[in-house]
Curated annotation (Swiss-Prot):
Keywords: Coiled coil. This is Protein dct-6. Residues 312-347 form a coiled coil. InterPro entries: WD40/YVTN_repeat-like_dom_sf, WD40_repeat_dom_sf. The keyword Membrane does not apply. The gene is dct-6.
Amino acid sequence: MIESTTSHQDFQQRSMTGYALEHPSYRIRGALFRHQDDGRLLSGCGGDIEVIHALELERSQHTCLPVRVTNVVVFGSNDVVRLIQPIEGTEDVIVNGDYHVSIVQSVELFESSTVSKSRILKLPGKIIAVNAEKHSNTELLLVFLLETGIFHYSFCAHTSTHFQCIQAFRCNRPITSGLLWRDSGLLHVAYYDGFVRVGVVHEQYDDMLLVKRVAVNRNNLSVLLDVVFEEIGRIQKFEDTEKQRREDMLTTSKSLSDKLVAEEEVVEGDTTNDDFAKLKIEFKNQSIRCERVSQRLTSLRKLITIIKSALDMNDQIEQMISLLVDELSELEKLEQLCKEVERTGNQNLIGKSWIAVEEKQMVVEELIAKVNSDQIKKHSDVWEQKIDQIIDQLNGCSEAAKDMRLIISQNIFEHRGDKKDVFTHFVLDAQSRDITLYCLSGLTTMAIYPRKGKRVASISLDASFATCLTAACAMKSAEGVYVADQNNVFPTYFYRNRPKAGKGEKRYLDAGNQLQLPTFDSISSILVEPHQMILGSVTGGLLHLSFDFASNYEHFVVASSILAHPISSGSVNCIKLLATGESLLALHCTDTEIVVSEKDQERWHRVTHHTGGAHAIAVTPFSVDERGAFAVVASDTFVRLKVLQYAEESLIGLHDLGESRAEDENGHPIEVLNVSLDPSMQYRQLPCKLRYAVGFADKAIRTYVALLTGQHDFNVQEKFIAQIEPLFNVQNMICFHGRPMGCYVSCAKTLQIWNDLDRHQQKKLKSERMQLLKLSSSVTSMERAEGYLLLGFADDRLSIYEEKGNGAVDLVGTVDDWHKGLNDRIVMSLRTRASKTSCGTRLFIHSLTAHHIVIHTVLVTASKIEQHDFIVAHEHSMSQPIGFEFVSYKYFEFLVYGRGISNEKLSIEDRKRMDNFRDFEFN
């Protein structure tokens, strides 16, 4: 029935340029933007953009089927898309993350593509706000409000280096939030650095043009010299103008002072004080301009000096080259003469002629050596370094940081709130009758008229209702603003009172009731349109809401549809994959819930969940025969035991079997850090026993044996406490086969091995069963595979230890320079596949970095590393990952998790590289 009702839409969609049947990803949606030309929805998804066609949106809303998207790779794992904005006068968009920005062309939004790295710029600080405008057909002016100040960049499409910093104002107080916009051509800024301030930024386009001309002609000395002298002439004219302007301002100031002293009473309507305020702004602007001009003049003088030295060096090089050309021509003449002498047959003349040729060749070789010497290369490097320093001095990047109030040429508004009242969002409503700026915090909403420079209205909540805002957006059908925290969306309406006779219009803010949302994920972005809203979530969810058309103020939700299903509610803390033989299950946890998901082709479906957050999971292998698995889930101060099983042929159930906790001497619960299961544990029919170990924050590992009865209460017996005195905390913990269970535990530069943790004799805490290893670097990750223990270190090393079966381990070897030239140093989140061969044990070791999955192979023979090879560093798409897991039965597929999940696959070439090291044997 669905196919019949939507077949005409499918035909239209398939005929569209670049239409792709791709499933949406499960990464954080930090930005939503509706393209005005054709109604496409652009959604930031991690570091990429997902484009959803308007017909696809309509189809999903009517059928409740997940949308299909076109994916455009922008930042990948390097950043998260935070904002998508149109570039006025073009069909292109500018995309920014926390530290990166990119220009994305409209044609790239039709096809699944990757943005060129040359169009991606990394900024020197965290990006707070961006403003972009078109200057010509090939050039854009980009303004960035960073945590460290305001930076102007030029983007030129015709140069190899597209981006160039042309003006910078560095501030001495970190800016945490803000907004940039243009009104009547003037650049306005609103920001929060402990104070809420709104003002106009003074822009000097002539200064920007100078920096751009110097950067473009940096290797053309003659043109560069003309640029410098032209600028010096302009500065001299500027100095004359500023001197006259300062004299006029001093005259005006003196006359105003005399007027104020002479008048005892203030006359109504007198604008003297306003004139003083304007004069103050003029003096400040002139001070800023004059300071910049003096610094620029000093930089230009330096530039003239280095140009002169460069010209001298160029003259020397040209002289050597001309001399070399002369010597080469003489050498050719000598060779021709030698050939003529050979025809005479006079051996004496032949010998003398060839001696002359060899001498001339030696002279030529010496000249070539001089021309190709390191001195010329050094001169070129020094020139590049000096010209970069001059450009930084001209654009202001090398200037000392100053107060932001000195950067703003005209201060429009200032507000000092409570220190606990931190403003996190600024929203500009340019569609209202009077342009309105909303300043938002978790407690306060202020409405400001920037053109009038005054606060019109404000509203504050009680401190008990304080929340952390994650998104904000201006209303479309009425005046006001929507704010969102992780769980809810709240409207704040901006009302007008009808003016009474003789009184002006009064405006006020009023908080409305929160929207009634269906069960959803943590909200990360919001897009408001007339009578509808779209919400983005942390793990890839998209929720569409339709409002009642009858009222512009009471926004009742009359319909909702999930355009893309989130994988969970909040960031994924831990995930375990279970292969059932028919499908793939994922048991994962967040701060608020524990979820079981099932994979169907490339899409994950939530099957069931339990409320209550967790941060670590240990699980037994899935028993295909018994169709179930046990799980130990670590929460803040307790451990839950759960069973995952098929209740019927295809119905999956997650059952809570109870919980265990530990208390200190004062009866306070002890924080749980991590959990681990005895590797011999398997799923069996209840009742049965389950052995597991728990690492606590009181420097102790407690092991338990639980008698599971199938009821919510179960018998648990604390068998042994390993008090790890040399350590200050339990950082990594893995159980292994002991008598009957042992445990590896690490913290900082120490590794302990405990064996037989299931004994009752607690008197011998420091018996021969414990081994203590002091290491040279901090342990950052731990992995156990097929009788081997792998340790990753903070200094880019990995060590392999072999288990000896008596509660001890021996060092097999260490691999240095693990990341092979990558910027990452810490070896984190190890996963290993092992296979035994006649030659030894082959280990395929995978480690996770911020941007890559690094794969090595090691062959261990006779307790030694026989062979080690680096295979590949696969770049994943998850920004700020927490960990990763293997996909069962697929050696080339991984699941990376953090703020969402990302399914990663090795390319065909990378799989072939791995196959070169796979040992195929028939046993």
